[in-house]
């Protein structure tokens, strides 16, 4: 079944018109609305919500907090974007879907790579070799053709700035 989330999100925008000037905030409403609908259906049908996020998205923070990572199980969460494409192709997913330009669909013309400032192949390689792997910045630039220090620093910054998205919210320790 296809459930249209736009009318639901529009109700939120009408309730808080002062916030509708922020495109990112509005896009996040769509993503969080989708999560609410997913859980509503899952609860009603005694099911679980499966995620579609990958390691590149998780590590760079390219997801909406309490939105597209609000899932019960994320079977491809440990795979880099390249690995997800390879898996999809090996399972016979049509090439037009495998090669489709990644987008969160938050607004017209939006693409993941434009927002990240790097293509996924570069992000995956930097994550695998430098962030998750043993190579220094210098060794990574020497290993990856066309990758420079600024691109590595961009990925490092994305990882650092999104740490809060990969952690439970802070809470005070219990009183002794």
Regions found by a protein language model. Name each.
Residues 1-14, 18-48, 52-55, 62-176:
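ATP/NTP-dependent adenylation/nucleotidyl-transfer catalytic domains that generate, transfer
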């Amino acid at each position: 079944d296809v459930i249209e989330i736009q009318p639901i999100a529009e109700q939120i925008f009408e309730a808080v018109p002062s916030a509708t000037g922020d495109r990112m905030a509005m896009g996040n409403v769509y993503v969080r609305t989708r999560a609410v609908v997913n859980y509503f259906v899952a609860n009603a049908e005694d099911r679980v919500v499966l995620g579609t996020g990958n390691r590149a998205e998780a590590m760079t923070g390219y997801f909406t907090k309490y939105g597209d990572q609000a899932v019960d199980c994320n079977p491809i969460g440990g795979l880099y974007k390249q690995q997800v494409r390879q898996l999809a192709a090996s399972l016979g997913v049509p090439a037009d879907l495998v090669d489709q330009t990644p987008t969160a669909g938050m607004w017209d013309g939006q693409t993941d790579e434009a927002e990240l400032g790097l293509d996924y192949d570069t992000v995956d390689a930097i994550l695998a070799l430098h962030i998750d792997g043993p190579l220094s910045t210098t060794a990574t630039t020497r290993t990856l053709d066309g990758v420079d220090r600024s691109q590595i620093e961009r990925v490092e910054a994305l990882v650092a700035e999104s740490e809060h998205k990969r952690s439970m919210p802070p809470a005070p320790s219990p009183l002794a």
